[in-house]
């Protein structure tokens, strides 16, 4: 597969933020035929150091909530600003995926790239802990 969007993110500085397989390539493939509308409010669940959040905001035009339990929101905010994104385009949030701090039906979509396996293994997780935050007709990838 050709990765025209994610190729732009293969710089040494950005590649240092990767902790496993290239999440930007994974995300591009995951969203190849996505149905989330541009300007949607999206949660990047398990966003890590924010590389996938930047990708979602820049390449798809989403307003992104970069939610991660282990990353420092202030460090992520500085990274997002350095990438030319405003605080309105991308919002870093320290959040436990099993106790999300958002209003019900807040997101048009949730994208979780290479992290869902850590918190989604509980059979009740999707219905009880994640779906309540997705608008009716919203998407999870």
Task: Cite the ranges covered by each PLM segment.
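Class I SAM-dependent methyltransferase SAM/SAH-binding core
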Residues: 43, 49-99
């Amino acid at each position: 597969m050709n990765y025209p969007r994610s190729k732009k993110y293969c710089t040494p500085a950005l590649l240092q933020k990767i902790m496993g397989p290239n999440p930007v390539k994974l995300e591009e493939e995951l969203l190849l035929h996505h149905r989330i509308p541009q300007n949607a409010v999206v949660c990047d669940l398990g966003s890590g150091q924010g590389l996938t959040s930047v990708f979602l905001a820049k390449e798809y035009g989403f307003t992104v909530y970069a939610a991660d339990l282990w990353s420092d929101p202030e460090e992520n905010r500085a990274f997002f600003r350095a990438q030319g994104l405003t605080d309105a385009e991308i919002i870093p949030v320290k959040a436990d995926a099993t106790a999300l701090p958002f209003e019900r039906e807040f997101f048009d979509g949730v994208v979780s790239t290479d992290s869902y396996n850590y918190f989604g293994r509980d059979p009740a997780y999707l219905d009880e802990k994640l779906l309540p935050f997705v608008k009716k007709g919203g998407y999870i990838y």
